[in-house]
Amino acid sequence: MKKIYLVFASAITLFLIPFLSHADDHESTSMIKVLLVDGQNNHDWKKCSPVMIDTLQATGRFIVKRAIVAKEEIADFKPDFGQYDVILSNYNGDPWLKETQHSFVQYIKGGGNLVVVHAADNSFPKWKEYNEMIGLGGWKGRNEKDGPYV
């Protein structure tokens, strides 16, 4: 099981290298604000998310806020995505409200960043913009008519 956590930590670090590699950028000393979204997943998010948080915080470059979005809390999940430099998704669950989806699309269109971890590519099979953001949606009834799928 520890190997799985090491793989998750390595994957997160790999995806976030662009944020760490701007040594000449005057903003390189500022903290990178991350919103980690989890709370539903077919993988063990309760163990994986803390490893991601620890890995990011160990660099001294990230401030991580965690949004645990349980089924019964979907209606209350309306974050101000614009407060964050990157959204880290370890979420594979029920669809967000249309209002939250719209807000998220606007965040991405405005230059926001998204890192999708493993099963998070499965989370919204019918949300076209999300599947365009991630480049490849998966599972949950998608097929070749929906575009590329795994």
Show which residues each predicted segment covers.
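A glycine-rich, often tryptophan-bearing local segment used as a flexible ligand/cofactor-contacting loop or short
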Residues: 37, 94-150
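Short beta->alpha connector loops
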Residues: 69-72, 92-96
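Bacterial N-terminal signal peptides
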Residues: 7-18
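Aromatic-Pro/Gly-enriched surface loop or interdomain linker
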Residues: 24-84
